[in-house]
């Protein structure tokens, strides 16, 4: 998982029938429920036992279409507008504004995944994607750079979790999955309090040596080809500078900033390819 620290309260949405292998994965994952167009009998039987029968299993009609108009009432005022039925796809990646015009098939896939994620993520938001999955999301921030920093730090943690030292951590007997996830997150942090460090050590059968800053930096050099999507334009080049540190090579954003030229210049300096979609993906 990209952000295992945020799994509590999660729901899983699946676009196809849930089979037994999928249900076996879900049965061990932290989530509050699953929604899908169908379930095999074996999958439904297994999921009905999760959380002592309290796990939410919902079947949705795949042909359902919500109303064309949606409305919200605020302090007695009713706002009505057309439903956002935009389906982000590769057609939004045609306007490549950088010197590097190359978007490999895998990058197109990842950029589309990033845009779809942004459509349903609390604004302001930035999304990192790689190998067909989201690896970091910065959501609900008040500035674009904070979105980028948050998404980048999550992407870094996602990649650091694959470090041999992390994969070789020896946990004490009986330490459950969620506690392991929390422990790995703390193990990779450099700002633990003394109390946190004491509690962390209790979770290991063998106390591990912390990864040094240089060891982390060296490992993160292997993070490359990352796709980044932003739900609105980048107002300053600092977003590009931070994104580059976390392996970003491809970017999609709406464009429209008075400083677009400086942002493009930064992308060109790093050899990035950036497309202007012309579409903001705000979600409030």
Question: Which residue stretches match the model-derived regions?
Answer:
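ATP-dependent carboxylate/acyl-activation modules
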Residues: 1-250, 257-284
């Amino acid at each position: 998982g990209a952000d295992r620290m945020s799994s509590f309260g999660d729901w899983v949405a699946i676009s196809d029938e849930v089979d037994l292998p999928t249900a076996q994965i879900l049965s061990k994952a932290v989530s509050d429920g699953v929604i899908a167009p169908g379930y095999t009998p074996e999958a439904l039987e297994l999921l009905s036992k999760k959380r002592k029968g309290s796990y939410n299993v919902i079947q949705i009609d795949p042909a359902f279409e919500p109303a064309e108009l949606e409305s919200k009432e605020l302090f007695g005022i009713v706002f009505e507008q057309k439903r956002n039925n935009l389906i982000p796809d590769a057609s939004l990646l045609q306007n490549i504004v950088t010197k590097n015009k190359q978007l490999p098939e895998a990058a197109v896939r990842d950029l589309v995944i990033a845009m779809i994620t942004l459509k349903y993520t609390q604004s302001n938001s930035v999304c990192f994607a790689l190998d067909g999955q989201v690896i970091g999301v910065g959501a609900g921030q008040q500035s674009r750079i904070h979105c980028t920093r948050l998404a980048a730090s999550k992407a870094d943690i996602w990649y650091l979790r694959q470090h041999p030292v992390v994969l070789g951590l020896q946990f004490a007997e009986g330490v459950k999955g969620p506690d392991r996830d929390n422990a790995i997150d703390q193990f990779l942090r450099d700002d633990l309090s003394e109390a946190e460090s004491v509690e962390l050590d209790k979770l290991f059968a063998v106390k591990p040596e912390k990864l040094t800053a240089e060891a982390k930096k060296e490992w993160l050099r292997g993070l490359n080809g990352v796709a980044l999507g932003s739900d609105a334009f980048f107002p300053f080049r600092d977003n590009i500078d931070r994104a580059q540190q976390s392996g970003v090579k491809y970017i999609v954003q709406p464009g429209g900033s008075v400083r677009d030229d400086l942002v493009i210049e930064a992308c060109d300096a790093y050899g990035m390819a950036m497309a202007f979609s012309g579409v903001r993906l705000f979600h409030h």
